[in-house]
Amino acid sequence: MPEISPAELAKVSSSSSSSSSSSSGRASVKIEEIEGGAAASGVVIVSEELETNPKTVVASIADETVAESSGTGNKSFSRVWTMPLEGSSSSDKAESSSTNQPRLDKSKTERQQKVTHILAEDAAKIFDDKISAGKKLKLLNRIATVKHDGTVEFEVPADAIPQPIVVDRGESKNGVCADESIDGVDLQYIPPMQIVMLIVGTRGDVQPFVAIAKRLQDYGHRVRLATHANFKEFVLTAGLEFYPLGGDPKVLAGYMVKNKGFLPSGPSEIPIQRNQMKDIIYSLLPACKEPDPDSGISFKADAIIANPPAYGHTHVAEALKIPIHVFFTMPWTPTSEFPHPLSRVKQPAGYRLSYQIVDSLIWLGIRDMVNDLRKKKLKLRPVTYLSGTQGSGSNIPHGYMWSPHLVPKPKDWGPQIDVVGFCYLDLASNYEPPAELVEWLEAGDKPIYIGFGSLPVQEPEKMTEIIVEALQRTKQRGIINKGWGGLGNLKEPKDFVYLLDNVPHDWLFPRCKAVVHHGGAGTTAAGLKASCPTTIVPFFGDQPFWGERVHARGVGPSPIPVDEFSLHKLEDAINFMLDDKVKSSAETLAKAMKDEDGVAGAVKAFFKHLPSAKQNISDPIPEPSGFLSFRKCFGCS
């Protein structure tokens, strides 16, 4: 299958009438140090699904990326150093002059230094607002290539040290103390509003927003949850108003599993991606202003809550002149503490840059559709590709729905960003389990849960055989969730295995001794809350991120990528989870998370960042000059 350059990807995207990518793509980067003589610079090779760690580029764009996440505007670029500093010590000079190296070697080293310096400058120019859009595309095409398997190869020097991060913690634009705790926000302060939630993804992506919507509704607000038609019954049963968004989560999930991310593995894959994204993007505006499809009651949104995969949400908010608040279950704001979950970068100096690279590659696939929406539907001017006009930085508030006991808020995230806690939806209290399931659970020891939710499994029969054999070898009982993947087709029934369809995790997991799953944020949260040691088998997207966090916290083994799933690894993982120390660590973490109320935290964060009460909610919301930034296209701060 042919490789695809960013320029070719952009060309196909622009000429196609279809749409781009989904929430849980993966871009990974392999970083290697290349030897090339005494003074040669290291080179970062980004391959195997886009990651990135150009230390040099991080040094050159640190001011810009800090501005984006902290709300400060600084467009200055530091000088990119890829060669030894001129101010080296006299002893270093003496040693250098006394070394008698062949002229050929010296020439080779100098050439490599020159090449790496050029690469660094090229990478830095991608984020320079003085460079034209066409030039930026050529630069990106020069240093990045989408490989046949949907991965990206990217080369830049890696010898620079990132600049220290300075976060402005002054007063926010809405008159709220920048570091004011969300616990101090008055929930009764905001008058009733009509709020629309624009949510794209699987059932696990939608569920926490159902919990938040119900809480907002309790405070007197009208909440419309706009998501895929597949989840209409789920939303209506929760007592919420539903509006259909485009896109089919089954198709999106199947594409992501096949391609290991949002980058297409070949030209034939691009239309699949784009058809889905076009349907999503063009359904956002109607969701904000069209009458209720069932009752016909009129609706006009006063505010938007969205997740990043609802590409186009910020543009709709701009057109309607209403505030928007982005919530997500995985990091989407640049930080130097860990890389973008859709990337893999080992060196900390590349963590921040990984967010820029992931955004730029997503933007390649959707910019024509977004601009078409802006011109034809929103009556706005087009967005410049990879615009560096950060201005005062994005002021879009972000709320991250995970426990700070699992992943604390990074120190370089500014006042517009909150870590609110996991957002649980109570499904257990109204659940009536089948008598057969209750009898099986009571007939023996607590089982181990194994399931991969709504993700399609490539070889379900083989995976089922591995699961059953691993349970038998470790002498454990197991519950297999068949899900969308078709697990559980046993050749013959097993007394120690129980097969089930959907069961609320908050009911089932407290009755299990350990869990094995794909690593979705919601499933991970439910397992940890139930004190269950956890093994994560990531398929794509943010799942490896959660697998690594679980392992780092000591409550589970190293994640097992689905392509490496084997009897030996699953057996080792089960034995790891059965260790008393691991169980104790899981209980300690669950105890720390016990008093968290992520739903209340999300509601308070939403209220905290709304315009001041002195400003009418229907008044235009001032937007920073950086609205045309490519980062803004994804709702990134």
Curated annotation (Swiss-Prot):
A cellular component term, taken from the record's GO annotations: cytosol
Region: Disordered, residue numbers: 1-29, 66-112
Alphabetically ordered keywords of this record: Glycosyltransferase, Lipid biosynthesis, Lipid metabolism, Steroid biosynthesis, Steroid metabolism, Sterol biosynthesis, Sterol metabolism, Transferase
Superkingdom: Eukaryota
Pfam families found in the cross-reference section: EryCIII-like_C, Glyco_transf_28
Protein's job: Involved in the biosynthesis of sterol glucosides. Catalyzes the synthesis of steryl glycosides (SGs) and acyl steryl glycosides (ASGs) which are the most abundant sterol derivatives in higher plants. Can act on several sterols like sitosterol, campesterol and stigmasterol. Both UGT80A2 and UGT80B1 are required for the normal production of SGs and ASGs in seeds.
Protein name: Sterol 3-beta-glucosyltransferase UGT80A2
Gene: UGT80A2
